[in-house]
């Protein structure tokens, strides 16, 4: 029989991993893998069209519309067709990305939040494990068994909340350990240095005044 406590813990762990890494990062990684398998031909066509359009633009810029009108018109038609094909390919890739994002978000929600809700509701009356008799006061025992598990046991909902709290605490501890310590910076002296810098200027002004008096 599958251990229900372990299943709930793994679902909670998966949810926390998604929160730590970031949904957008996971979605980008998944779409890159999906594109490499299913959209490699379209992506290669996009790169080829983009390269061709750039070459046609450069050649069109070097061609005079007055001196070489026939060649210029031919290049212009070729460039317009290339731009139209490139836009069509870009729209195809954009549509595929949008569709993939919706499906991936739905799948991710079902695997994390949806699975947690389903497990908590489906096994709401089943105790995950029992507490020793008299180990906690009655209000705490009732809270741990909420909503429908027997008093004295830990319900699936309470167990999921405990797992989330423990994982969040571990995350905070790891982040505090990995965080760089702020560098010790001493106070910047301003008064004495400015006073020292002002002394030569004061001496120069006094000497100038004495010379003016002598003159």
Swiss-Prot record:
Q: Which GO terms describe its biological process?
A: tail-anchored membrane protein insertion into ER membrane
The protein's UniProt keywords, in alphabetical order, are: Coiled coil, Endoplasmic reticulum, Membrane, Transmembrane, Transmembrane helix, Transport
Where does the UniProt annotation locate this protein?
Endoplasmic reticulum membrane
Ranges for region Disordered: 182-202
Q: Where are the transmembrane segments?
A: 5-24, 109-129, 154-170
Q: What GO MF annotations does this protein's record show? A: protein-membrane adaptor activity
Which portions of this protein are annotated as coiled-coil regions? 73-94
- Where does the UniProt entry say this protein principally localizes? endoplasmic reticulum
Lumenal compartment segments: 1-4, 130-153
Q: List the stretches on the Cytoplasmic face of the membrane.
A: 25-108, 171-215
- GO CC annotation: what is one? endoplasmic reticulum membrane
- Membrane-related topology note: Multi-pass membrane protein
- Give the multimer and partner information: Interacts with GET3.
Similarity comment: Belongs to the WRB/GET1 family.
Q: What does this protein do?
A: Required for the post-translational delivery of tail-anchored (TA) proteins to the endoplasmic reticulum. Acts as a membrane receptor for soluble GET3, which recognizes and selectively binds the transmembrane domain of TA proteins in the cytosol.
Q: What is this protein called?
A: Protein GET1
Organism from which the protein derives: Cryptococcus neoformans var. neoformans serotype D (strain JEC21 / ATCC MYA-565) (Filobasidiella neoformans)
What is the name of the gene encoding this protein?
GET1
